[in-house]
Amino acid sequence: MLIPSKLSRPVRLDHTVVRERLLAKLSGANNFRLALITSPAGYGKTTLISQWAAGKNDIGWYSLDEGDNQQERFASYLIAAVQQATNGHCAICETMAQKRQYASLTSLFAQLFIELAEWHSPLYLVIDDYHLITNPVIHESMRFFIRHQPENLTLVVLSRNLPQLGIANLRVRDQLLEIGSQQLAFTHQEAKQFFDCRLSSPIEAAESSWICDDVSGWATALQLIALSARQNTHSAHKSARRLAGINASHLSDYLVDEVLDNVDLATRHFLLKSAILRSMNDALITRVTGEENGQMRLEEIERQGLFLQRMDDTGEWFCYHPLFGNFLRQRCQWELAAELPEIHRAAAESWMAQGFPSEAIHHALAAGDALMLRDILLNHAWSLFNHSELSLLEESLKALPWDSLLENPQLVLLQAWLMQSQHRYGEVNTLLARAEHEIKDIREGTMHAEFNALRAQVAINDGNPDEAERLAKLALEELPPGWFYSRIVATSVLGEVLHCKGELTRSLALMQQTEQMARQHDVWHYALWSLIQQSEILFAQGFLQTAWETQEKTFQLINEQHLEQLPMHEFLVRIRAQLLWAWARLDEAEASARSGIEVLSSYQPQQQLQCLAMLIQCSLARGDLDNARSQLNRLENLLGNGKYHSDWISNANKVRVIYWQMTGDKAAAANWLRHTAKPEFANNHFLQGQWRNIARAQILLGEFEPAEIVLEELNENARSLRLMSDLNRNLLLLNQLYWQAGRKSDAQRVLLDALKLANRTGFISHFVIEGEAMAQQLRQLIQLNTLPELEQHRAQRILREINQHHRHKFAHFDENFVERLLNHPEVPELIHTSPLTQREWQVLGLIYSGYSNEQIAGELEVAATTIKTHIRNLYQKLGVAHRQAAVQHAQKLLKMMGYGV
């Protein structure tokens, strides 16, 4: 729940001097990306901007305090301020901020700018007291904000110091409007206006000018002088002499003498007690100070000029001027030290009564009241956890003694979930084991079941499915029906365990059950996870169309609940990319993989490994080996700098081995084969994939017998577990083994099986990557004209894709390739003495790829007669007499350059 006063622009007070010269400068603020108002405390920054903002509608105001260094809190308030300015235009961002469904502040801001693209009016966002921000992540995010904000948005920042927002760059590009302390300082005329409003009897212009000069136009000093002159008999001149040369850091003595010592004791105590509140209203004041009419007392303090200011138009919320508020809080610690814990307790109770547990926790911590803090957490901690107030919860739990946690195991569970959310798996088990050791009877009943549900989640995350299964079953046996969250967790874990064991039908049923429960109780991240798992299971079963439809349902959930920036969104777009790749929709597959990388842009690069492998698969299917090699360099660097799940390693190895196959790199394959993991089982698609990688490497090395043993065992497991997509892949690899071993009839038999199974899976690209050997077999089958209609149609489609694949695979004669070729030490002398034109190199590449003259003419969009001329010229330059000789010559050049052809 957001505190309204933090989003309210300060009310323009009576008796303030209208800063016409500065307002004139600010009138052009809409021409700048950033308006920066900087000065020490008390120069009137907030008052000036509140004057400028008066009458503007498209403006959001965000007043910071120390607690806004928490990223989630900063995001919530900033988006709320934008919503205030746009009348709720950015609904998606608002939901994402409220539910903490974003990967980082920068990704949230990126979504904000997408929504603001449809907002065409001038828009202003004011952030007051930015000097309170010390979190470097927020600074970096705000630099991103300024770089990418829409042209019609102006950010207005008020700060006591120069903020870390890339100011120099903005200044150079003339995108910065600056107002500093010298401009904020009162002029003689403004000082005279000020005193005329504040003093019962006017002072001479010369005297007000002298006072103004003596305090360098510092507004707070002028206000103190006027207050002192009203409260005492001595002149403003005398007060000015005392203030001359004093700055904000040396005001304490003056404020004691001239303010606190000149009010009655009741007012003094009111000021000191109320100052502990960062913002205050009638109910808070009544509870904290004991005054019966808090609103009336606040208005009275305001009339006395005691540095109290209204925070909203309703007059409900107030706060002290920051300078005066800090002074009062320090004095409160000295003068009311014995009462201070009780004052903070009263503040916490009042904030709780108004529904602001975060503020209540702030005061409970300040009071050092562990019992109060415990009670607040017992009632509100899980709500705060679900809203990602993780830093606040961690600080709160650390403040509680261990005995208090033991007396309230729910808080131990909360602390463990905090650790789990931060991937501190070892600490989770240590904490729960310690708690179980010290809490009587914890090993039985509901709490133990909740512990086990969490332990099960930790175990599956840590790659221990057997332990996860045991714990999840125990949890489900002991959990009452109403304990929905832990039941969702345990059911999801059990479904994932069965998935790992290859028991796909049972796993699918449990994931569907998880989805149903998660939707019922609005646990959206588990609903999303269960749908992704369902899609992956259906893919493994060979039901790719149903997997597609499940993915469509998942995308709908993401859009409805604004889950776009959860890391799980990357998982979804990645498995969508895998499906599109299987169907040879390569452009769409690549776009999906790139969108997955974008989702993970604010995470460690290692997290992008899977999507990068998918991009390499797309390059391989297109035959773009140069691009694949470039991407593989990055993938291998990531592999060497991270710890990954076996599924991730299997997918990374897959593209490496296929690349080695396409380039004939037997040395790399042999080296990998010596060191790679050889799983004990092959009962899921992760392990099947790794064993298939091993078999592919063995085939490349001519080790046909061990490869056949591997593939036959994989097929046996795949058939028994109904891993139909894996069976389809295995058959294709077995086909390649038989073909290369000269067992043509066996090769044809398994190819026919693979084509038949592809009617169910829809596979295309899995055939295509096997290249020319596959093309030869398909041509033979098509010529025999014995294939059933569906298989015939698929074979023709695959053949078309292979032709395109080989064109790209071998048409390397672009400018970069030719330049490298000409610089190669072994290049034939004839190439130097009779150089080919770039067009002739292109024609040679297409001849090698098997294109007829008519196809080459169509590809290059020239007349057939022109192509004949090019061919005649390149034959003459290469010293060849016919097409086959040209093909052999091109093949020699490619082999010389390291391409396995």
From Swiss-Prot:
CDD domains: LuxR_C_like (cd06170). Transmembrane segments: none annotated. Gene3D superfamilies: P-loop containing nucleotide triphosphate hydrolases (3.40.50.300), Tetratricopeptide repeat domain (1.25.40.10), Winged helix-like DNA-binding domain superfamily/Winged helix DNA-binding domain (1.10.10.10). SUPFAM superfamilies: C-terminal effector domain of the bipartite response regulators, P-loop containing nucleoside triphosphate hydrolases, TPR-like. The keyword Phosphoprotein does not apply. HAMAP family: HTH_type_MalT. This is HTH-type transcriptional regulator MalT.
